[in-house]
Amino acid sequence: MAKGVREKIKLVSSAGTGHFYTTTKNKRTKPEKLELKKFDPVVRQHVLYKEAKIK
């Protein structure tokens, strides 16, 4: 069986709360870093989440 192309990534809040989401992304089709606006429950607002590597 072939190994999947999708790699696990972590989306870290830019509000500095330490909150993060985990997701997967296809590195072959989207080599740039992912930035999404998502809800941060710590500050109770929609903030920018930036891609970081899962350690």
From Swiss-Prot:
- State the superkingdom: Bacteria
GO CC annotations, alphabetized: cytosolic large ribosomal subunit
Q: List the disulfide bonds.
A: none
Kindly give the PROSITE patterns that the UniProt entry links to this protein: RIBOSOMAL_L33
- The chain's coiled-coil residues are none
| Alphabetized UniProt keyword annotations | Ribonucleoprotein, Ribosomal protein
Q: Which GO terms describe its biological process?
A: translation
Which molecular function terms from Gene Ontology are attached? Answer: structural constituent of ribosome
Q: Which family does it belong to?
A: Belongs to the bacterial ribosomal protein bL33 family.
**Would you tell me the protein name for this molecule?**
Large ribosomal subunit protein bL33
**What is the native source organism of this protein?**
Pectobacterium atrosepticum (strain SCRI 1043 / ATCC BAA-672)
Q: What is the lineage of its organism?
A: Bacteria, Pseudomonadati, Pseudomonadota, Gammaproteobacteria, Enterobacterales
